Design a protein with these regions (language model features):
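Carbohydrate transferase catalytic cores enriched for Leloir-type hexosyltransferases
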Residues: 1-287
Length: 287
């Protein structure tokens, strides 16, 4: 609050969804809405945070002039739970940082790769169990997993699986350049997320023209135009495991490089940055 009083901006952009305190000043407020997961997936966030999120976002929207969404899906779900958001000026533009600047030589080192947060919401439990089933069915590729460990039970599951199958490797947090090196050498990227607001890793992987295997969440269809391998997530846990194992055995290794390029170009930081710039500048000039 003190900094805002000193700076006196035309627009205050909050990069998170909720502003827990009421701000006072002669400036407009823009918030960023990434997802409605605390409402949609209470099992991952808990009942207390669900109540906190609903209560405080409703308060935040009363004082919000502009909304930046990361996807059309997020916009739809926000307006479903908070119809008042329909009356607030908004734009859909997800700015991706750390773009790929080096030209990597792609190879196939015979491994599946997952890089992301190590939690159930990202489908890591499904990935481990699906991979073990894939090996039971005769699959030969290795599995490399990277990402910050978030949950104790996932940590136990991963290390137990590594004891059972020496073809599973867990790398913990993966630095940016190492991640790109792994992308370049993988056979396919596996992203079995159970709840996703956008799915930035999929866009990153498309730069390498590698096959992608993902759950059939609607957001993945939105951002990829349907140009990836997907498996059915809307079934029992056992069926999910079987579905993932089967597609790991039989995924389409061919990639439509022109379709990938079109998706990558749509999410270039320069393009999305201009959308945000025009939105903010246009609002400031008209209000």
């Amino acid at each position: 609050k003190k900094q805002l009083e000193l700076i006196k901006p035309d627009i205050f952009w909050e990069v998170n969804t909720i502003i827990p305190v009421k701000l006072k000043g002669d400036y407009r407020i823009m918030i960023t809405i990434h997802d409605m997961f605390p409402i949609e997936y209470v099992e991952y966030f808990g009942r207390v945070y669900n109540i906190y999120f609903k209560h405080n976002l409703k308060k935040t929207l009363k004082n919000t002039d502009m909304i930046l969404y990361n996807s059309e899906q997020t916009k739809r779900t926000t307006e479903k739970f908070f119809p008042e958001a329909k009356d607030i000026d908004n734009v859909n533009a997800y700015i991706i940082s750390n773009p790929v600047r080096k030209n990597w030589i792609s190879t196939d080192e015979n491994y599946f790769l997952y890089i992301g947060n190590m939690e159930k919401r990202k489908g890591v439990d499904l990935l481990i169990n699906g991979y073990l089933k894939y090996k039971e069915l005769g699959g030969k590729k290795k599995l490399i997993i990277g990402g910050k460990m978030q949950e104790d039970d996932i940590n136990t599951l991963v290390h137990d699986a590594m004891e059972k199958d020496k073809d599973i490797t867990y790398l913990d947090y993966v630095a940016h350049n190492k991640k790109l090196e792994l992308y370049a050498g993988m056979s396919a990227f596996v992203f079995p997320s159970k709840a996703e607001g956008f799915g930035m890793p999929i866009i990153e992987v498309m730069r390498f023209n590698k096959p992608i295997i993902a759950s059939n969440l609607p957001i993945f269809d939105e951002i990829t135009d349907g140009n990836i391998n997907t498996f059915d997530l809307y079934c029992s846990a056992d069926e999910q495991i079987k579905n993932l194992a089967q597609i790991m055995l039989n995924y389409n290794t061919n990639v439509d490089e022109s379709a990938y390029e079109a998706v990558v170009n749509r999410y270039l930081p320069e393009r999305l940055g201009k959308i945000v710039y025009d939105f903010v500048n246009g609002y400031r000039n008209n209000n």
